[in-house]
Amino acid sequence: MNDKRKILITCALPYANGYIHLGHLVEYLQADFWARFQNMRGNECVFICADDTHGTPIMVKARELGITPEALIAQSYKEHTQDFADFQVQFSHFGSTNSEENRLLCEYFYKKMQEGNHTRSQPIQQMYCNHDKMFLPDRFVKGTCPKCGAKEQYGDSCDVCASTYSPSDMKDVHCSLCGTAPVMKDSESIFFKLNDFKQYLEEWIPKHCSPEISKKMLEWFNEDLKDLDISRDEPYFGFAIPGTNNKKFFYVWVDAPMGYMSTTEQWAKSQGKTLKDIWQDPSREIYHFIGKDIARFHTIFWPAFLKAAEFRSPNQVFVHGHLMVNGEKMSKSKGTFIAARTYLNHLNPEYLRYYYSTKLSSSVDDIDLNLEDFTNRVNSELVGKITNLGSRGGQMLKKKMDGKMSVPDAEGKKLIEHAQKTAESIAAHYEARDFAKALGEIRGLADDANKYFDEKAPWKTLEADPEGTKQVITTTLNMFRMLAIYLKPVLPFYSQKVAKLLGEKDYVWSDLNTVLTNREINDYEHLATRIEADKVKAMVEEGRKINEEIQAAKKAASTAKPAAAPAPAAAATAGDRPAEIEFADFDKVDLRIGQVIEAEEIKEADKLLRLKIDIGEGQIRQIISGIKAAYKPEQLVGRKVLVCVNLKPRKMKFGMSEGMVLAAGTGGSDLFVLSADDGAQVGQRVK
């Protein structure tokens, strides 16, 4: 009989218009703990995630940066995957909802909805811009917040007071593109008849959600469920709905959960299998990890979609709480709204993994990242209790003795046996996602080992009883090894270093049954060092400064008048103008459309950026451009620009510059890189 479980787990998809922050990591880390634990136990656990890439906010952010939505999501994908990798989150596959697999799935689901008579059309009134001849998504509408009076806020939520509302509730409403007042106009929308699945969902939710989530979700069932508008009007970055002549697009909350399946399909293809081989396999367990703010989408809308398309639903939806910092909501002004990359600039990722594991349970309660407690617990527990065992025992054996273990003494054997018997209890806590309880038992074993080591005081018996001393150290190192095995789901790299110290391969759960004796160990390498308070302060300060810059940029954008043309430069006199040239002279200048592939600051230069630009036909040019004061490198990546490609290459102090990027302005921060319309292709000549 094969007891190996087949498991598929997913996390909510991070949105591709922003960075990963410490709040996001509450979810991704706990899912990673659980996936690693399952694989350690010999189960096959596939861990799937993807970037959520569609919707109006993506369009707006790309427009602000002057790049295409595709370039924005490519940039986010690179940043997100790097952040996850550096935090040791090990996905089986990380995809994107902007994939062919996802488009085909959306169309398939929609077809099944139609075949089951689960859709209907109805005209609804929406804001329409007569100037731009288009319906306006919420993010293309600006006005005064109806709650706090803040001006130039988007049509769905206020950046100042965080209120949500309808665009029709706002005052001084105008199109964010041209500044004109919109009118109300009918648009035919497509609705999913959610109430068709009311009885099914009432039975499904209690079986697949925790009691506290079930109770909350079933409050929606006191009356008929409202049909869900699954369509959005153009312009929209997403998938066009079949049969609408590219005028209607799937709402992002339709294609986002499909991303679980399309990314699973991509992984399945890499294994020579199909989506149905994985998703429809009745022996495979499927679990969703999500935050409580999106529980409704995953426990009402998503199961109904799956039922309509005749796909199985997940075994369980695991819902967690949010992150508080120092007992309060994450704050941008206080610097506690911390990006993953900001944390990584200052601290070891395993320290946060450890701290979160001491806080997380299977409940939906929020967890608190108290920065003082974080520092103290890492220093006293991970460094002082756990790592110190390996450090003291390993270094004494290697430096004071011959570097070879002996056998545990009688008391040590009992200590090790007790630690082994704790395995199933710790495993049960991991299985139940009660990570804090698992860590509590692990710390208890560390306390036992430290008490044993201190009472035996091997540093005192080294000369008088070398063999007895070696037995004490052997016991201590075996206990340290077991702690590293128990901690592997939480601290995978740390565990690998312990295995290397003891000359072993990567640990699996069954290695707990083994006791090391008469083994030569390797040189001890530092596994964890104390956190300095100054590093935590520096991290918070960096977070505060970054968020100040972001808020200043938002404020500048919100106070800027839509569609206002730049102030004209002072009129030049006839004598200031260059002499006229013949067309043949102008024709000598070869201007082409290029796309910025890479951009980086030249730290030694105040004004220069180093750009790598694709000018077509497989040619990548390096161009050194004096636009540093006006643009950050990340604002340029993916952008289509105008390039003079036949300018004679110029050897500069910082490398060869092979062309010129065209920009307008007076210089310094008053520079504006010239861009091409969306239809222009890389390599095309400007005429």
From Swiss-Prot:
Gene3D superfamilies: HUPs, Isoleucyl-tRNA Synthetase, Domain 1, Methionyl-tRNA synthetase, Zn-domain, Nucleic acid-binding proteins
Co-factor(s): Zn(2+)
Cell compartments where the protein resides: Cytoplasm
Catalytic activity: tRNA(Met) + L-methionine + ATP = L-methionyl-tRNA(Met) + AMP + diphosphate
Residues at which ATP binds: K332
Cofactor note: Binds 1 zinc ion per subunit.
Binding site for Zn(2+): C145, C148, C158, C161
CDD domains for the chain: Anticodon_Ia_Met, MetRS_core, tRNA_bind_EcMetRS_like
UniProt record similarity statement: Belongs to the class-I aminoacyl-tRNA synthetase family. MetG type 1 subfamily.
Assembly mode: Homodimer.
Function: Is required not only for elongation of protein synthesis but also for the initiation of all mRNA translation through initiator tRNA(fMet) aminoacylation.
Name by which UniProt lists this protein: Methionine--tRNA ligase
